[in-house]
Amino acid sequence: MPAMALGLAAGMASCSKSFTDLTPQGTTTDANFWKTESDAIFASNGLYEHFNDDNMFGRGLFWFVNASDDVVTGRTDAGSAAVRNFTATGNESRINSMYKKFYQIIQRANNIIVKVPTMSISDKTKNQVIGEAYFMRGYASFYLSQYYGDQRAGVPIVTEQNMNENKFTRPANIQENFKQIESDLLKAADMLPLLTTYDASNLGRANKDAAYAYLAKTNVQWARYDKSKWAQVVKYCDMVTNSGSGRKLIDTDNPAVDFASVFYVENNYSSEYIFSVVSNKVYGSILPAVMFENTGYGLYNGWGYFHPSLELYNSFEAGDPRRKATILEFGDTFTLFGQERKYFSSNSQTGFQFNKYMQPFRFPKDQHLNPNGDYPTSNLNIPLVRYADILLMKAEALIMDGKNGDAEINKVRNRAGLSNLSGATLTQLKRERRSEFAGEYTDRHSDLVRWGDAQAAYAKPATGRQHTVKTDPNSPYTIITVWAPRNFNPSVHHVWPIPPQDVSNSGIAQNQGW
């Protein structure tokens, strides 16, 4: 395999044969592999190994979300500050590995697409594994395109046709990437089963609805350059809704609980689930603990990153229960390891903490949390796409096409106990997305960029509450500037810098202005 900055790892990823236990277990080679159904399944499991990588959906990609006006860094260092301030070089340890890791996923998918069709295994397994490979290639390419590509240059397209080339070039524009992503995800949708057909040990694998969902997400981004793609967003959102898997919001007419319960361990695979980072007590995303109080009041090793801003807190509509489900403020009552207490923080820069992923912390520590506080995973899956996003993407597409998106947006609002909108506007849609997806990988920053709102939003300071006694839940506060206004140049900062080592090794051009 050629050595190149795209990080296309030659060796098969080594992992357990169980989808839910992807602990590395040595290496394999072509000489002793690609023989049996177990080999094919083993290879497909390697597509998900990045779920256990802090540099991906632990903290890594959240540094991009953290650039938004919803979040303030917490425990700031020079590298994280550079990312948030749009002065990064791409060398920063916070963000210098995601680019190559997404290409590693693509290479693993390419290996499957090349090798599995000729294996003497059942058609069912063959279709499943190849379908997962097409999905994960499209999924990885989606994130690469969203973060690194634009109309001036796409990101290198690597498929089974050119995977062994020594050099790659950047396509003329990102629309070339979108075409490849769409092709891959359509193949995946054709080959993959509905998620409801999986047994418990395989829940979390790529599925038909996830392929349609990422097709919708791809076309939302594509519509920035081609307005006709809004109709495709509606089409693919409807394909999720009508697939037969029963995707719907968790809505029991109990607004105080329903939204919060989306992020309960027992609802990892609820009717709202489409695709998530699979996690358990020894494997998966550490994001919940990353957001928890630094050192966790001496009870558990929280890391104290990513604090909600006062701007996010104030953005919620009056009476919206999603604010309480999303944010802890001083004096709020919450349960920690079986004991009720009132929230305070010696760590928070803003006086707030994300509450969205705190359910695993309600119980005795050994029930849902990794005993290893140095890699504090939990049993809570972290959503990448959920059904509320399908509804709000469709609503946005309809509004952008001059049509009415009230039905979809009001389903989301009604679940929160809020009144119906009539003739919902794009401004109202934007607020709804902010309230629904705060602190998630759905990514407020990417929304602001594609809407053209980032420059104005980031020209304002991020503020918070400075409490006079940080250990007193009832302490009074003053409003302070936590992060100064930032200079966001929409002709440069709409994408991120490709890590310079990858640029140097591959010979591709860096994104303009970085």
Describe these PLM feature segments.
Residues 1-24, 446:
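Bacterial Sec-dependent N-terminal signal peptides
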Residues 14-16, 72, 102-105, 180, ...:
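Long, intrinsically disordered, low-complexity segments
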Residues 16-79, 153-155, 178, 186-187, ...:
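An aromatic- and glycine-enriched ligand-binding surface/loop that stacks and positions planar moieties
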Residues 37-45, 49-52, 76-148, 168-177, ...:
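Conserved, well-structured interaction surfaces
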Residues 125-131, 198-211, 422:
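A glycine-rich, coil/turn loop motif that links secondary-structure elements
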Residues 148-175, 227-231:
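Short coil/linker segments at helix-helix boundaries
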Residues 317-386:
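Flexible, polar/acidic helix-loop-strand segments at domain edges
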